[in-house]
Regions:
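Non-catalytic, conserved peripheral segments adjacent to functional cores
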Residues: 1-109, 128-130, 140-202
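Conserved metal-binding segment of the jelly-roll/cupin
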Residues: 106-129, 135-138
């Protein structure tokens, strides 16, 4: 019943994929398969996922940019409620697109999924009042292996939609708001990450 649509190497970055599941709707509502291993393998994607995670965040929350160093994770992410702008940054040192980023809007309405291979930093910005975010990963969380990089590093130049503010030399959220005045909200840890030149490379 599957038949997913897969756009590969989005943004010209090898391995990044945007996936659209087949949605079967009628007067009652809809049904879709959010993950089908057989369909993924037929699309050339053979990944063994070991854990599912879910988070809820309010408008203006930015989580990221995160990765694990010795235990890198491939992630398959989607929004099940609300809208987020999801971003991946290539940190593979041997990649022709090292330091390049790609972003995609994920929402409960468009039902798109974003596949991010190992070797990337990942993060997202919540654009709706609330967003529930789900992701599958192919390795477990290792708290002592966490890494990250600044979400606003000018060398990367991520174009976060609806975000206003001026870079002041750090990952601090101070002075940044969305267009409607909602303050940008980051964890203390995410405001301390450094830029690309000082970030772990895979």
């Amino acid at each position: 019943m599957g038949q997913i649509k897969v756009e590969k190497n989005v943004g010209g970055i090898e391995g990044l994929c945007v996936i659209e599941p087949a949605v079967h709707g009628d007067a009652r509502g809809y049904f879709m398969e959010t993950y089908n291993e057989k369909d993924m393998k037929e699309a050339g994607i053979d990944i063994h996922f070991v854990q599912d995670n879910q988070s809820m965040s309010t408008k203006g929350v930015l989580r990221g940019l995160h990765f694990q160093k010795q235990y890198p994770q491939c992630k398959l992410v989607r929004a099940v409620c609300g809208t987020v702008f999801d971003v991946a940054v290539d940190l593979r040192s041997d990649s022709a697109t090292y330091g390049k980023w790609y972003g995609v809007a994920l929402s409960a309405e468009n039902k798109k999924q974003f596949l991010i291979p190992e070797g990337f930093a990942h993060g997202f910005l919540v654009l709706s009042d609330e967003a529930e975010f789900c992701y599958k990963v192919n390795d477990f969380w290792h708290p002592n292996d966490e890494g990250g990089m600044a979400w606003n590093d000018p060398e990367i130049g991520i174009e976060w939609p609806e975000l206003k503010g001026e870079y002041k030399g750090s990952a601090s959220a101070e002075g940044y708001t969305l267009e409607d005045g909602t303050a940008l909200n980051l964890s203390d840890k995410d405001q301390k990450w450094l830029g690309l030149k000082d970030t772990f490379k895979f």
